[in-house]
Amino acid sequence: MQKLNFMERSDFNGRSEVVKELFGKSDGACVTPPFYCDYGSYIEVGKNFFANYNCTILDVAKVTIGDNCFMAPNVAIYTAGHPIYPDVRSAMWEYGKEVTFGDNVWIGGNTVICPGVHIGSNVIIGAGSVVTKDIPDWAVAAGNPCKVLRMITEDDKRRLFRDEEIDDEAWAEICQKLGW
């Protein structure tokens, strides 16, 4: 991890090799330093994983991230927790709960994912969210605590943002690339 954090930003091949060492594979993974984790060996990422600046993954339990998942700057994924009762907590007890992401997940900046959370496939989590509970497939969710705001539908295919459609030329190119 230290090696990754001190590499030249332009050394994409070197960063890819370090990511492969850290996660056991890279397969199109890109991690923009600085990046922090407890071990790295409990983190499994799918194809085309992207973590922007200052990603923190406390991996005392397994973290499984699907294909095509993107994390904006300052995303934190926590698997570690501590007992509620003060005397037990002060004895330095810790537990870990797995965190999982499906495929095609986009996590907005400054978001915290708490221990034990499962985020489904094709999900967007809005910036600044604190995710304390599972999020179903095809959801747009945000807030503190994070809640489902709406579901992603076919109507969203041509949308860049809520009220802005992709122009016809770009749409034709997208359809061609996707084989639609």
Model features per residue range: what roles?
Residues G108-D134:
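Beta-rich strand-turn-strand
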